[in-house]
């Protein structure tokens, strides 16, 4: 079944967005088809960020309705072009976010040369402007979404192994943490480091501006001897917490983050980003490890 997707013309969409913004500020702005009668002149800024059309006869009529007819018949509308080119600010732009250091004025063309489609019609202090192209509206900040949260995980270490080992792991085994570390992650981004203290943890460094990419890849040879030798990265997650932006900023000020009671009894074991089990954080001789309490084998029977 094919999807019926509504097509949107980006040019007209930008014109419509600007029309809505102008109307919100009390200025009349409409999307409509211009008349193809008479002569037209295309204007733009030097950077070509916007372009618009004017009808010189309409501008003369706006200035002096009584003289407009005689002026057009005498060819006076052609004088509008050099006047526009010679005047530094011939009119005030009716769209607030537009600017123009230098106006580019093209030669008059007949109405048949106007582009297809609707144009945005807005009145300036000199006459009507018919905008053909407009840039995007400036972004308006809506403040922080207070209900939005980010998932943090506090990692105490990792171990590199191979796929063949996973099939031999069972409940009661102890997975040793080969690389001890205390790092804070949000999704695949490393935010900083933390220290474990009595009653919780303290985030020592929190760099939100320069977030590092987590490297989930393991150095391997160019060719693998078999699927069982595929690399696996085990990650041991001490704690997870969803935080607001304000809470995240507070962590960077080394505030104490309280941990749930017995958090050491439920350390998550991730393999290449997938949760495979959990267990208790233990220390075997001089090496930290996790004694497995729950394990999801590849057969899915939990053994």
Curated annotation (Swiss-Prot):
Keyword Isomerase part of the UniProt annotation: no
Gene3D superfamilies from the UniProt entry: SpoA-like
GO biological process, one term: positive chemotaxis
Keyword Magnesium carried by entry: no
Keyword annotations: Virulence
A Pfam family reported for this protein in Swiss-Prot or TrEMBL: FliMN_C
Organism domain of life: Bacteria
Stated role: Involved in a secretory pathway responsible for the surface presentation of determinants needed for the entry of Salmonella species into mammalian cells.
Family assignment from sequence similarity: Belongs to the FliN/MopA/SpaO family.
Protein name: Surface presentation of antigens protein SpaO
Biological source species: Salmonella typhi
């Amino acid at each position: 079944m094919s999807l019926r997707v509504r097509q949107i013309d980006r040019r007209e969409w930008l014109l419509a967005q600007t029309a809505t913004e102008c109307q919100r500020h009390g200025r009349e702005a409409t999307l409509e088809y211009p008349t193809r009668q008479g002569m037209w002149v295309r204007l733009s800024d030097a950077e070509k960020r916007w372009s618009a059309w004017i009808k010189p006869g309409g501008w003369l009529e706006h200035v002096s309705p009584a003289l407009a007819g005689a002026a057009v018949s005498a060819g006076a509308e052609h004088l509008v072009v050099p006047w526009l080119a010679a005047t530094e600010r011939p009119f005030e732009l009716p769209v607030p976010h537009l600017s123009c250091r230098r106006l580019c004025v093209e030669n008059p063309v007949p109405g048949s040369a106007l582009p297809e489609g609707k144009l945005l019609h807005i009145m300036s202090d000199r006459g009507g402007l018919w905008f053909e192209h407009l840039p995007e509206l400036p972004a308006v900040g809506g403040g922080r979404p207070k209900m939005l949260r980010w998932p943090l995980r506090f990692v105490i270490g990792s171990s590199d192994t191979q796929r063949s080992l996973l099939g031999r792991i069972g409940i009661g085994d102890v997975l040793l943490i080969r690389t001890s570390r205390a790092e804070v992650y949000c999704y695949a981004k490393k935010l900083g480091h933390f220290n474990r203290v009595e009653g919780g943890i303290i985030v020592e460094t929190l760099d939100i501006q320069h977030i590092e990419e987590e490297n989930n890849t393991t150095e391997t040879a160019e060719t693998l001897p078999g699927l069982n030798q595929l690399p696996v990265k085990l990650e041991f997650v001490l704690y997870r917490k969803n935080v607001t932006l304000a809470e995240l900023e507070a962590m960077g000020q080394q505030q104490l983050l309280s941990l749930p009671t017995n958090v050491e009894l439920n350390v998550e074991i991730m393999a290449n980003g997938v949760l495979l089990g959990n267990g208790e954080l233990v220390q075997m001789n001089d090496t930290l490890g996790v004694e497995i309490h729950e394990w999801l084998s590849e057969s899915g029977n939990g053994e």
